[in-house]
C-alpha cells in the first residue's frame, strides 16, 4: 500500500487476520488507516442543548444520521469537520474543549455510542456498567434513563475509577454510583437484580487502528486468545446479576471472532437462561451499515479430550449457529468510523430474581445479619439539619441529599431507595438489611451540588447549578448581559456598583448567590459571591461559554 499513512499496515498480522475474517477485505484496509473524524455526543439532559447544537453547526459540525437526536433516549452524535485531535482553529478548539469540560458534550467515537443505543434503557431502570472507565458509555447510560433510576458504574483500577468520578461530575448526572471492584467478583446487588447490563469488555482494540495506529505493529493472532477467558468471566458474572426479563449487551472494539462470537457461543453454552435476541439496530441506529455475526472462522485451539469443546473454534451446536447472526458487526469502511461488535442478550429464566440472588435455602434466606459499620469518609444520607438548611435558605425541597466532607450531593431517588436502602444477599445465602453500601466499595454517588464550610451551607456548586438553578427560590437575582460582560472582562464590581445594576441585591446577605440571565433562548445560571465586591464563581469552561454567548473574545 504505497503512500500509506501507517507503512506497516499492509504487512501486519492484523491485515492477514482480517483477510481470513471477510472476503472483501481490501476496502477495510483502505478505510482502517486514515485518522477518525472528531465526533461528539450532545448531552440531552442539559436545558441549553439547542444552543450547544447551534454552536456545533456554526463550527461546521453535522449530526450523524444514525445517531440522531432522541433515538433510543440518547443524545445526538455529531461529526466535526476535522480529524480527531487535529483541529487547526484555536477558537474552535477552545469552544469544543469548553463544551466538553462543562458536560454539554462528550468526546466519544461514533461507534462507541452504539452499545447503549441497542441496550434499550428506559427511565427508572437499574443499570450496571461492569467495565465503565473512562465513563463515556456510563454517562450515556445516565442520559438514556433520563437521569431517573440508577447506573452502577464499576471499574477495578483505582486511577481509572477516579477518572470515572471526574467524568460523572463533568456530565452533571445524579443517577450514577461509581464502584471499584474486579468485575469478575462484583458483589450481589439488591433484588431483583439489574434491568439492564452493559459489558464493554477489555479487548485487543484491533478495530481502533484509526485512533490507535500502534495496533498495526502490536497486534498478534494470539492477542484475542489471551483475553478470551477474562471476557467470558466478566460476561458470565454480569449475566448472573441480570433480572429475569432484563437485557444485557456484550461489546468490544475488536474485529476478532475469538473475542466476539466465540465468547457469545461459550456464554450461551454456560448460561442456559440467556437468549441472543434481535438488537433492532436498523430501528435504533437508522442508516448504520452492519453485518451479521460470524458463524465460521479459522481457529487453532488445542483440544485434548474427546468430549472437550474448543472455546476458540466455531460452534457445532445448531441452536448456537442459528443464533450468532443476531450479533452486530460494524466495519470501519462501511460507515467511515471505527469498528465494533455488539451482542444483545435477554434473561429468559423462569426464576423471580437474578440467578446470583437466588438463595441457597429458605433457612439461609431468612438469616438476617446486622449491617457492618460504614467505612470512614463514606457518603451517607444528609442530616435533617442540612436538608432543612437547603429548604429554608435556598427554597429547594424534594431532593435526595447525601453528605461527605464539605459537600452535599444530589442523588436520584433510586440510588437511595434501592441501592442504599435495599436488602442484599451475602455470598453464603444470608441477607443484610439495607441502610449502607456494603458489600460494595462505593467511590462516589450522585452529583456534588452544595458546598459547605464548618458544617454550614455555603452555595450551590458550579457543577450542580444546571440542575439546581430552576429549583432555587431564594438568593437568585436577574442580571443583565452588560453587567456580566463587564465582570468577565474587568472583574467584579464593588457591591455598591452592582446594586445600582441589580437593585434586588439591596439587603442581600453576604455569601453565595446565583445570577440569572436570559440570552439567546437559553437561561444562564451563574454562581456568584457577595462580599465587598460581586464576584463570579465560575470555572474556566463556564466562563468561556458565557463569554461566547455574550459575544466576547476572552483569553483561552
Language model features: what each stretch is:
Residues 71-121:
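Class I SAM-dependent transferase core
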Residues 124-133:
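Conserved class I S-adenosyl-L-methionine
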Residues 159, 192-237, 242-245, 249, ...:
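Mobile active-site "lid"/loop adjacent to the S-adenosyl-L-methionine
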Residues 138-142:
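Conserved SAM-dependent methyltransferase scaffold
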Residues 154-191:
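S-adenosyl-L-methionine
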Residues 148-152:
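Short beta-strand element of Class I
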Residues 194, 247, 255-408:
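Class I S-adenosyl-L-methionine
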Residues 1-61, 321, 336-341, 346-556:
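Polybasic, low-complexity RNA-engagement segments
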Amino acid at each position: 500500500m504505497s503512500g500509506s499513512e501507517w507503512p506497516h499496515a499492509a504487512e501486519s498480522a492484523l491485515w492477514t487476520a482480517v483477510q481470513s475474517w471477510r472476503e472483501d477485505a481490501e476496502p477495510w484496509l483502505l478505510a482502517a488507516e486514515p485518522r477518525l473524524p472528531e465526533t461528539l455526543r450532545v448531552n440531552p439532559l442539559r436545558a441549553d442543548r439547542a444552543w450547544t447544537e447551534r454552536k456545533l453547526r456554526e463550527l461546521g459540525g453535522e449530526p450523524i444520521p444514525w445517531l440522531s437526536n432522541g433515538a433510543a433516549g440518547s443524545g445526538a452524535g455529531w461529526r466535526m469537520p476535522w480529524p480527531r485531535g487535529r483541529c487547526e482553529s484555536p477558537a474552535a478548539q477552545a469552544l469544543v474543549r469548553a463544551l466538553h469540560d462543562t458536560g454539554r458534550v462528550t468526546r466519544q467515537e461514533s461507534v462507541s455510542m452504539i452499545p447503549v443505543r441497542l441496550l434499550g434503557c428506559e427511565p427508572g431502570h437499574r443499570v450496571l456498567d461492569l467495565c465503565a472507565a473512562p465513563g463515556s458509555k456510563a454517562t450515556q447510560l445516565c442520559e438514556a434513563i433520563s437521569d431517573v433510576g440508577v447506573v452502577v458504574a464499576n471499574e477495578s483500577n483505582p486511577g481509572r475509577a477516579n477518572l470515572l468520578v471526574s467524568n460523572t461530575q463533568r456530565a452533571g448526572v445524579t443517577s450514577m454510583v461509581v464502584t471499584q471492584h474486579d468485575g469478575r467478583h462484583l458483589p450481589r446487588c439488591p433484588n431483583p437484580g439489574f434491568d439492564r447490563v452493559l459489558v464493554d469488555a477489555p479487548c485487543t482494540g484491533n478495530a481502533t487502528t484509526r485512533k490507535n495506529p500502534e495496533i498495526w505493529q502490536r497486534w498478534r493472532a494470539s492477542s484475542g486468545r489471551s483475553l478470551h477467558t477474562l471476557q467470558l468471566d466478566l460476561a458470565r458474572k454480569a449475566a448472573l446479576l441480570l433480572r429475569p426479563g432484563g437485557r444485557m449487551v456484550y461489546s468490544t472494539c475488536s474485529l476478532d471472532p475469538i473475542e466476539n462470537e466465540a465468547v457469545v457461543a461459550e456464554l450461551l453454552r454456560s448460561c442456559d437462561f440467556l437468549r441472543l435476541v434481535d438488537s433492532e439496530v436498523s430501528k435504533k441506529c437508522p442508516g448504520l451499515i452492519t453485518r451479521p455475526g460470524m458463524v465460521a472462522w479459522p481457529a487453532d485451539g488445542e483440544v485434548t479430550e474427546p468430549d472437550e469443546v474448543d472455546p476458540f473454534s466455531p460452534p457445532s451446536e445448531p441452536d448456537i449457529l442459528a443464533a450468532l447472526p443476531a450479533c452486530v458487526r460494524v466495519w470501519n469502511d462501511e460507515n467511515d468510523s471505527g469498528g465494533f461488535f455488539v451482542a444483545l442478550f435477554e434473561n429468559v429464566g423462569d426464576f423471580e430474581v437474578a440467578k446470583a440472588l437466588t438463595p441457597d435455602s429458605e433457612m439461609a434466606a431468612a438469616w438476617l445479619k446486622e449491617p457492618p459499620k460504614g467505612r470512614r469518609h463514606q457518603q451517607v444520607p444528609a442530616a435533617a439539619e442540612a436538608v432543612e438548611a437547603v429548604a429554608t435558605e435556598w427554597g429547594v425541597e424534594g431532593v435526595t441529599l447525601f453528605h461527605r466532607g464539605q459537600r452535599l450531593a444530589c442523588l436520584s431517588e433510586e440510588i437511595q431507595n434501592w441501592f442504599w436502602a435495599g436488602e442484599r444477599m451475602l455470598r453464603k445465602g444470608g441477607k443484610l438489611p439495607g441502610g449502607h453500601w456494603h458489600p460494595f466499595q462505593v467511590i462516589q454517588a450522585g452529583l456534588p451540588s452544595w458546598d459547605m464550610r464548618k458544617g454550614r451551607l455555603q452555595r450551590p456548586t458550579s457543577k450542580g447549578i444546571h440542575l439546581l438553578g430552576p429549583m432555587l427560590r431564594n438568593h437568585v437575582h436577574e442580571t443583565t448581559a452588560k453587567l456580566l460582560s463587564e465582570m468577565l472582562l474587568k472583574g467584579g464590581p464593588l457591591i455598591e456598583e452592582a446594586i445600582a445594576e441589580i437593585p434586588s441585591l439591596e439587603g442581600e446577605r453576604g455569601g453565595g448567590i446565583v445570577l440569572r440571565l436570559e440570552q439567546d433562548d437559553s437561561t444562564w445560571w451563574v454562581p456568584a459571591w457577595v462580599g465587598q465586591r460581586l464576584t463570579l464563581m465560575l470555572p474556566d469552561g463556564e466562563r468561556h461559554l458565557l463569554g461566547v454567548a455574550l459575544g466576547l473574545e476572552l483569553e483561552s
